[in-house]
Amino acid sequence: DFKTKYKRSVLGVLWSFLNPLLTMMVQYIVFSTLFKSDIPNFSVYLLTGIVCFSFFSEATTMSLTSIVGNASLITKVYVPKYIYPLTRVMSSTINFGLSLIPLLFVLIITRTPIRSAILLLPFGVGCLFALALGVGMLLAAAMVFFRDTQFLWGVVSMLWMYATPIFYPESIIPSNFMVIYKMNPLYHIIRFIRIILIDGISPEPKAYALALLVSFVPLLIGATVFKKTQDRFVLNI
């Protein structure tokens, strides 16, 4: 999937570096005058949110069609069906890993201290991977029985992006909405990663627990739904 994505592209895999940087530049210009005064190290804050959400969006969108898109293979060759969404998420993870390079570049350019806390990054990435896989498996199963899922997910993912503090500070959220706002799994995972990169410290123990909770509960739900419905995939694809 990763090789196919950049097939016949002039810049090829370089787009993994350029996409987050170009997106950050545009959003930085648009939002810096509005939010920069409230957000320390806005460029790192912004790019961290972009890179994390882009991975989640790409991984789940690719997973969505992982079963129906491989209908001919599934009906002819037996392969454990969870492999299909898993490989899509893993492909997006490679792209995500490459996009961390421009993030590191921005950290250096902005002279953000790179401390030992960065070694905790794999924990945050692992939680993000688990969340994407859980949602991806749920979407892949839903797509088999309800083809409008792809269009609904396009709307939901856009709303999810605006409900996640990617380019704005959480301080602008009214206090009476914060309880609902914090039900967003990406809020906790992105916050965890930002504390590591921007503050250079280990997050509080509660942040670890929340990151695990909001990532592995969706994974458990997605895997359970996928397992219970997979025997009917062949009849509906």
Regions found by a protein language model. Name each.
Residues 1-237:
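Hydrophobic transmembrane alpha-helices and immediately adjacent juxtamembrane helices
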